[in-house]
């Protein structure tokens, strides 16, 4: 986190002095941004505001929203942002040069593999991965992916998980994102197993009802500590969706609130808690999955929310998380017909809104490409290429990992994807890994 803020704070100096190359400028444009120096971990409230949109729970189609947060103040016992020294332009150029030098030393194949965030089963071919040994070592040498995502079946107990993740990381030439879905509530891969030693927090909607930013900050901070102790460095959380449809079961209580301002405050606090603990956070599922009734795990899901509605509601929590410095955003598979005819994670228009309208310059990742909204219409190679052409940086869990890699490499060789486009995404990936201390680049 310190490195990310240092690099960002010196952008203007670097540009003015002309010390970076075009590649360096691309790097800086990719950095996640944090606008607040203090953790917003408490919230004062006004009288309840009656919302016109439905509440998030199907059994209560018309409910008033919780008190909206206004002018949050940091309590005295909340950890304050440590003072950071300013890097000189020369030091900043050194950060840039290290990343660019590392990128220059990678082969095309190595760079393409970095774009994939898969499961240990997909990587190795085993049925259920609960350990990492020679098979994992050989698989990572052949297919050096950018990240691995673990599920409850992989996590037997704390000691087993810690050993598995330590071994896995030791086999990687370029250090891996080691990720898990730990939202709380019904999506708690580690917390749902008492043997893991990870706190099983309540669903996001419970915290949204209380609208206590300090409490949510502590949830993020605790998860960062507990997951980090196991070897994880990325949490696919928080959910930044605003549930505006009471019949939405895919998101439901995974959302903090049907009030975008409350949801935004909670998302900001969760991102802050996670990332101050050096855990990469991932906002999901842009451009917002709270208005739908159908499940993209099963097939196509369509939203008819207008751009104005999205800007005034669904995008408020995403903007709050981005402003707090979230390093990654996940795109959903839903098709918003007012934005694009394509699933969101294959849509240049959706990526453009995220980059330009919301100012996000970190890693954009797809939702799982094993879900019906993708597999019913695209093969693995086609979906991966379309996502990268749209401007996405990482492909999550392609149905056929090798076919996805082959499709991307063939597209580069054919000129429908350029190596410069690949480099752009890999630079973002390396930058986040470097900034969070996952990738160590010494002089």
Model-predicted regions and their roles:
Residues 190-207:
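Flexible glycine-/small-residue-enriched beta->alpha junction loops
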């Amino acid at each position: 986190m310190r490195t990310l803020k240092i690099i960002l704070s010196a952008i203007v100096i670097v540009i003015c002095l002309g010390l970076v190359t075009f590649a360096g400028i691309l790097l800086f444009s990719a950095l996640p941004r944090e606008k607040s120096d203090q953790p917003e971990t408490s919230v004062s409230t006004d009288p309840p505001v009656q919302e016109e949109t439905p509440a998030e729970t199907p059994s209560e189609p018309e409910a008033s929203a919780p008190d909206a947060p206004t002018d949050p103040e940091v309590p005295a016992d909340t950890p304050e942002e440590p003072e950071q020294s300013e890097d000189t332009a020369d030091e900043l150029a050194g950060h840039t040069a290290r990343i660019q030098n590392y990128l220059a030393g990678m082969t095309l194949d190595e760079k393409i593999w970095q774009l994939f965030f898969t499961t240990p089963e997909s990587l190795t071919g085993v049925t259920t991965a609960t350990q990492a040994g020679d098979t994992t070592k050989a698989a990572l040498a052949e297919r050096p992916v950018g990240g691995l995502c673990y599920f409850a079946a992989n996590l037997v107990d704390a000691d087993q998980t810690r050993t598995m993740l330590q071994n896995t990381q030791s086999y990687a030439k370029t250090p891996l994102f080691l990720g898990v879905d730990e939202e709380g509530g019904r999506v708690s891969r580690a917390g749902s197993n008492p043997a893991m030693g990870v706190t099983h927090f309540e669903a996001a909607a419970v915290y949204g009802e209380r609208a206590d930013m300090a409490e949510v900050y502590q949830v993020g901070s605790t998860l960062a500590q507990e997951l980090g102790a196991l070897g994880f460095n990325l949490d696919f959380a928080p959910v930044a969706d605003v549930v505006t449809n009471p019949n939405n079961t895919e998101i439901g209580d995974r959302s903090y609130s049907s009030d975008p301002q409350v949801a935004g405050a909670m998302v900001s606090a969760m991102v802050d808690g996670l990332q101050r603990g050096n855990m990469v956070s991932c906002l999901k599922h842009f451009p917002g999955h709270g208005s739908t009734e159908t499940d993209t795990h099963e097939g196509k899901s369509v939203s008819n929310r207008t751009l104005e509605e999205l800007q005034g509601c669904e995008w408020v929590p995403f903007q709050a998380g981005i402003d707090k410095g979230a390093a990654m955003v996940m795109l959903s598979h839903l098709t918003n017909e007012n934005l694009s005819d394509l699933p969101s994670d294959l849509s240049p228009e959706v990526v453009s809104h995220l980059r330009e309208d919301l100012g996000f310059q970190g890693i954009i990742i797809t939702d799982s490409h094993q879900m019906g909204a993708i597999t019913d219409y695209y093969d693995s190679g086609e979906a991966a290429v379309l996502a990268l052409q749209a401007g996405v940086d990482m492909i999550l869990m392609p149905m056929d990992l090798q076919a996805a890699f082959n499709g991307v490499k063939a597209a580069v060789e054919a000129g429908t994807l350029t190596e410069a486009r690949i480099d752009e995404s890999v630079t973002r990936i390396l930058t986040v890994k470097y900034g969070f201390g996952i990738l160590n680049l010494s002089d």
